[in-house]
Amino acid sequence: MSITPNVLATRYATDEMVALFDPINKIIAERKFWITILKLQKKSGLPITDADISAYEKVIDKVDLASIEKREKITRHDVKARIEEFNSLAGAEKIHIGLTSRDLTENIELIQIRDGLNLIRKRSLETLFLLEKNISKYEKTYMVGRSHNVAAQVTTLGKRFATCGQELLYSLTALNELINRLPLRGLKGPVGTGQDGISSLGSVKDLTKMEEAIASEFGFENTLTSVGQIYPRSIDFEVVSKLLQIASAPSSFATSIRLMAGSGLVSEGFKQGQVGSSAMPHKMNSRSSERINGMAVLLRGYTTMACLLYTSPSPRDRQKSRMPSSA
């Protein structure tokens, strides 16, 4: 099975971020989620044995995307195909008891989002440390400040770094707050009542206890208590808008660098062998700044699109303003 490379992943993302959203790793994450539920269901008295759990654990990393794709062509259902594949590998049929597809996929997506945001928080902190070094290094490097893009008053290059750092720190505070309160969806079933889970476990109390255990296992402090088949898409909007906010400081600073580079005030530098143009190899383009601004443009577009997601009518009841789950 061939996978078309994602341009953003190959040009922008770190290896850690690519691995987090890799299709194989996502399937492994789903399997870990199933196994976690299996163990909790066994504790609750469901007919699941240690041998059943062990059978699944032994094959958790055996992911064959081509085989799953073949199953999906028959079932015409992505989650059912992955269930059948995992059952076939383990030689058992114990996973997904009392669950609907979104009990799996919505929680996994929130886990991925949380982990991705944690990576961005880590890189943002690293960026702040680098900015601090340059603030000190260039605190007495004087230059002409500009207003309306014309010469104004004297400032320093260190001040430019400090302004970027101040905005990034403010944005990072908002990101940190979002990460801390980001919830799991929980095991709410097709319409949000958790009826299948209650029926299999015996009571609402037992289901709530299981949801709390799952949240703890995957590092979440919160689980949504009243939700439909999907978690509120306003959460997605908030996540994307926070990403745009994080990108704002680097993008603003990158724009300043490009403007200053155009008048010869600063330069990103020029590595050995680097060229600025196939026709004019001497050109010293602000390549990194251009890439930063390119990502910011994309994030502005994604934020605009995310505005259309945060109305969440009951799935499959009427036309939705987002891609349908079967797509």
Please name every model-derived segment.
Residues 39, 216, 255, 294-297, ...:
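Generic alpha-helical structural context detector
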Residues 171, 230-302:
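Glycine-rich anion/phosphate-binding loop at the beta-strand->alpha-helix junction
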Residues 1-194, 206-213, 276-277, 287-293:
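A helix-coil-helix interface module used to build multimeric assemblies
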Residues 301-312:
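Long, amphipathic alpha-helical stalk/connector segments used for oligomerization, subunit docking
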Residues 321-327:
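Hydrophobic alpha-helical segments, chiefly the membrane-spanning helices
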Residues 310-316, 327:
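Conserved small/polar residues in nucleotide/adenosyl-binding loops
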Residues 159-259:
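Internal metal/ion-chelating core segments
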Residues 37-38, 113, 117, 243, ...:
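Buried hydrophobic packing segments
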